[in-house]
Amino acid sequence: MVSLLDIIGPVMVGPSSSHTAGACRLGLLARGLVGGTPDSARIELHGSFARTGEGHGTDKAIVAGLMGFRPDDDRIRTALEIAEREGLRYTFGKTTLDEEAHPNTVRISLERGDRAAVMIGSSLGAGRVLVTEIDGFPVEVSGNYHTVVLVAEDVPGSVARIATLLAEDRLNIATLRLTRKKKGGDAFMVIELDEYPDEHVRDHIRGLPWVRWAFRLDKVSA
């Protein structure tokens, strides 16, 4: 079924929902992977993003998202200047990803303190986005839910333990995906939730001995 949002698009600053609203939401999601506004960002644009991104404000929108601005925030127009004042170092480039990549795709490499992350995501239109890769792991993150992402050792019972912790806090899991590159290696878990867990639950998850790191990605859809 086609929704009204699909027809008219989201409330936003800028001329194009794909190049501004979606781009801003990709920046918001990437931001969560390092726990806040990054110290530095390398932003590589693919396809249509690379060809028309600057003219459509894609560059401003992504940087705005990295600073926590929403798609309807008027500060998007001056996001690059704000980033420079705030000390966010950013560079832009063009890249060619594989043939299956959506035309409006970006690879964002971030550093914040001792944390680094690389995310690939696409703007699908009408402000909708899809993250397809995080730190080399294939994922599917829509931004339509509150999301927990974590890297953990591939040990038996890890998924059940985390699901139990969330259930004890009366949280409903919308989707849970686990990806691993090899048996016994690191496993990447993406959990989309209807509500975000309280701080004590997040601390408990981070404190599990086989969890290497865990971060939150806030819901970015309208």
What is the meaning of each model-derived region?
Residues 1-11, 41-43:
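Short, hydrophobic/aliphatic alpha-helical segments
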Residues 9-27:
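Conserved phosphate/anionic-ligand binding catalytic regions in large, soluble enzymes, centered on
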Residues 33-42:
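Non-transmembrane, aqueous-exposed alpha-helical and coiled segments at domain scale
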Residues 90-92, 119-222:
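A conserved regulatory-domain signal marking ACT and ACT-like small-molecule sensing domains
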